[in-house]
Curated annotation (Swiss-Prot):
Short name of any one Pfam family annotated for the protein: Ribosomal_L27A
Subunit description: Part of the 50S ribosomal subunit.
Species of the source: Cupriavidus taiwanensis (strain DSM 17343 / BCRC 17206 / CCUG 44338 / CIP 107171 / LMG 19424 / R1) (Ralstonia taiwanensis (strain LMG 19424))
The protein, known as: Large ribosomal subunit protein uL15
Disulfide feature: none
Protein role: Binds to the 23S rRNA.
Keywords: Ribonucleoprotein, Ribosomal protein, RNA-binding, rRNA-binding
GO cellular component, one term: cytosolic large ribosomal subunit
Domain of life: Bacteria
HAMAP family the record matches: Ribosomal_uL15
Length: 144
């Protein structure tokens, strides 16, 4: 047996379905589309969400919320993430280099999730009240 002699097991591969190629193929004439109607015509299919003229669901429900334009430029960083960092001073550049925030991010906020056991100085980042308390309890500080 050699690599150029290998063949797939019998019945494991199927030929591509060729529709509309004669009666003997089993998929000739109407080519599996049935008789008449919109779905049998070429290009004849409704758009996504169309409900046959009934008011579609996306129009029956009220509008809600909005897409924030600043979402891509803001980020959250947890105390758990900061604990894993080697740096004693943490700022936006350090977070970007560590891959904790994206390159487009312009401002980040530290949130209280996880524990902080070492002294850390936070520069130029926001912090929640709980995160501030945890950072200061560990001997760290938040610089403006």
């Amino acid at each position: 047996m050699q690599l150029n002699n290998l063949k797939p097991a019998a019945g494991s591969k199927h030929a591509k379905r060729r529709v509309g190629r004669g009666i003997g193929s089993g998929l000739g004439k109407t080519a599996g589309r049935g008789h008449k109607g919109q779905k049998s015509r070429s290009g004849g299919f409704h758009k996504v969400g169309f409900e046959g003229g009934q008011m579609p669901l996306y129009r029956r429900l009220p509008k809600r919320g909005f897409t924030s334009l600043t979402k891509a430029f803001t980020a959250e960083v947890t105390l758990r993430d900061i604990e894993r960092l080697e740096a004693a001073e943490v700022d936006l550049l350090v977070l970007k280099q560590a891959g904790l925030v994206g390159d487009l991010v312009k401002s980040a906020k530290v949130i209280k999730a996880g524990e902080l056991t070492r002294k850390v100085t936070i520069k130029g980042l926001g912090a929640t009240a709980g995160a501030k308390a945890a950072i200061e309890a560990a001997g760290g500080q938040i610089a403006a």
